[in-house]
Amino acid sequence: MPRLDVEKTIEELSLGEKVALTAGIDFWHTASVPRLNIPTLRMSDGPNGVRGTRFFNGVPAACFPCATALGATWDTELLHEIGQLMGEESIAKGSHIILGPTINTQRSPLGGRGFESFAEDGVLSGLLAGYISKGIQEKGVAATLKHFVCNDQEHQRMAVDSIVTQRALREIYLLPFQLAMRICRTACVMTAYNKVNGTHVSQNKEIITDILRKEWGWDGLVMSDWFGTYSTSDAINAGLDLEMPGKTRWRGTALAHAVSSNEVAEFVMDERVRNVLNLVNFVDGLNIPENAPEKALNRPQDQALLRRAAAESVVLMKNEEDILPLKKEKSILVIGPNSKVAAYCGGGSASLDAYYTVNPFEGVSAQSKGEVKFSQGVYSHKDLPLLGPLLKTADGKTGFSFKVYNEHPSESNRELIEQLHLVSSSGFLMDYVNPKIKSLTYYVDMEGLFTPEEDGVYDFGVTVVGTGQLFIDGELVVDNTKNQRQGSAFFGSATVEEKGSKELKAGQTYKVLFQFGTAPTSDLDTRGVVVFGPGGFRFGASRRVGQEELISNAVKLASEAEQVVVFAGLTSEWETEGYDRDHMDLPPGSDEMISRVLDVNPNAVVVIQSGTPVTMPWANKTKALLHAWFGGNECGNGIADVLYGDVNPSGKLPITFPVRLQDNPSYVNFRSERGRVLYGEDVYVGYRYYEKVDLAPLFPFGHGLSYTTFTRSDLTLTTTPEKPQYEESGEPITATVTVTNTGKVAGAEIVQLWVAPPATEVNRPVRELKGFTKVFLQPGEQKKVEIVVEKKLATSWFDEMREKWASEKGEYGVLVTGTGEGVLKSSFKVEKTRYWLGL
């Protein structure tokens, strides 16, 4: 299709066509105007993989490590490669636009989507986001920076007003977007759900137009988050180009009326349309046909990149007495709830059906040359494990039948609309469609056969956005149709899990029937959350086992084992969009299990998987500790590569791990109170706070050990002569450092450059990260590395009185750190105070 002549096309569009172009037509597509050769564009989540157009029963995709995992790599080249693969995955899914990366800021360890953002520091987050976006857009696919801005909690996210000073807004929350834009002018930006200082961002002219467009000179498309548009005229006039998803709530006839009554000027309408048409031209080279089929790639080279990313993200937190790496020839006992669970991604928009997954037990087993034993230790599921994979159909397939009807189960002569075969007993129906379905109200019968392997009492659980009843051999075991209570699943729109139990016999086959009614059949009060169309369902089961029995068995085996590794942590049940965690603790029983295992085997290695910090009351007991995040498809292999030394760990923490939740600077100001949240810590987010008040965290930002040792030496600074005002170059400062691998194995060092300000007009952090680089070295190898920072970015704070950045005169300290304790120091001067605005 030929590129559009944008100005000529705008002249030829009718008002109705212009209005249509400013809103989606469904969950994932924009409007088309065939007579003018304007195609529909497809977009897809998301932050750690390209799901495609279907949450429900979709085409599998590559799942990358979560953003905090990628943040832990501190590797811009790796992020660039990952972006390129994401672009190729997007093309395979027929998608022109990727809804990511996410670059919000982890004010608190509890944020439900904290795992979706790279770091608590704007420089690290912004640079990584810029390089992953660059990789995406080099493939012709549009990247989307989100959520612009201050969408840093899930509690009342659509209604909460984030009250933040202009200084903190600029220095902390807008900074990652600003720095990412300097590397890659992303084609799209997605607004946040929340208000900032009294106005929803999607209709906040100061943020969208004055800062993003005018000050930063960005000219791409601004879209809303899903259902995150709250007005007609205000949003259009503020600069919101595209309301998502369709069908529109705020555009349509209301927008046409606003234009005809001069509430929205026609030239403003044309600006919104111009940005849509420019996006069409941006992705024109993809040549993706409308309604393109979705395909899977899953190539060997992609699997290798995913494995490399998983391994590079692992952070070696402790390694006393060189417990690690483990010996492949020795036997090993694998313990813990995350051992046989592939915690490959968080929940919500980040979730997808991965091509395949490798859990930690599988990763260890594949590499060990000795005997591998397993002990559960504890279970850590928030809801009961999915029952679907344990069911069989009548013809012996794993899974169950999924039969759709318009009529309630009580009605006779129901007409079968569609029958599917599913394996997962968790389904989000927001994008399930069938032309025979008459409305959002319909019913599904799911049937399968369950043959337990052990006698005992089995617990069954049902979570729904809608209504659900679960029957075993015709007996109602779980009824989740009445007196429903709000839970956290499905973006916070679901009920809590309702449970029932039944005693079952090993080897006996039972018929399981789950009857589901869609969201309109529910009486649940869902004010303040988004209910996505027909809703969703989840049913699970587990044999009831006493926790003490499980822990005691693990402890006994650990006391006798040659090598022990404990896998614990969180999963997508605990960290998910739509819900903030209540605390930092591991799931019930995990801490006790780890502590008791360490009591009998102090050399046991502990591996924690989570996207954000957790408490570790046993940390002083352990000699060897890894943090492994949500590692994508290859999480198990990546962890095993590090455990056995095939990969030397090089990850560094992108977020601070406090000793306890109360130590976090946002502790007294997190979650919405009467519709607002006060960002009371101001610019003292993360390490800035801990260093300012001299409070030691459990593990600091930037921490991470290696199996080798490094030295850093010969720091030199090269500065640029000052001019009366800052020019576009920003007056580069080049720091040169010699890095030497003084150990016996190859490894990667991350060199971090910090700037410490002199006394200025305002209180400032003790030091701030301003640059970094990663270098790979063989044993004994030495390399010179350069880190280039701009003086104006390295020295400035935002002056609210002048409404400009202030680079104050004075002597600024330069600190260079990395693995180990050594710090190189130097300094440079700013001779004259200067003020500036811009990107």
Swiss-Prot record:
Superkingdom of the source species: Eukaryota
All residue ranges annotated as the PA14 domain in the record: 395-555
InterPro entries, sorted: Cellulose_deg_GH3, Fn3-like, Glyco_hydro_3_AS, Glyco_hydro_3_C, Glyco_hydro_3_C_sf, Glyco_hydro_3_N, Glyco_hydro_3_N_sf, Glycoside_hydrolase_SF
Active site: 225
Annotated glycan sites: 197, 620
Location in or out of the cell: Secreted
Example GO biological process: cellulose catabolic process
EC annotation from Swiss-Prot or TrEMBL: 3.2.1.21
Entry keywords, A to Z: Carbohydrate metabolism, Cellulose degradation, Glycoprotein, Glycosidase, Hydrolase, Polysaccharide degradation, Secreted
Reaction catalysis annotation: Hydrolysis of terminal, non-reducing beta-D-glucosyl residues with release of beta-D-glucose
SUPFAM superfamilies according to UniProt: (Trans)glycosidases, Beta-D-glucan exohydrolase, C-terminal domain
UniProt pathway: Glycan metabolism; cellulose degradation
Function, as annotated: Beta-glucosidases are one of a number of cellulolytic enzymes involved in the degradation of cellulosic biomass. Catalyzes the last step releasing glucose from the inhibitory cellobiose.
Protein name in UniProt: Probable beta-glucosidase I
Gene that encodes it: bglI
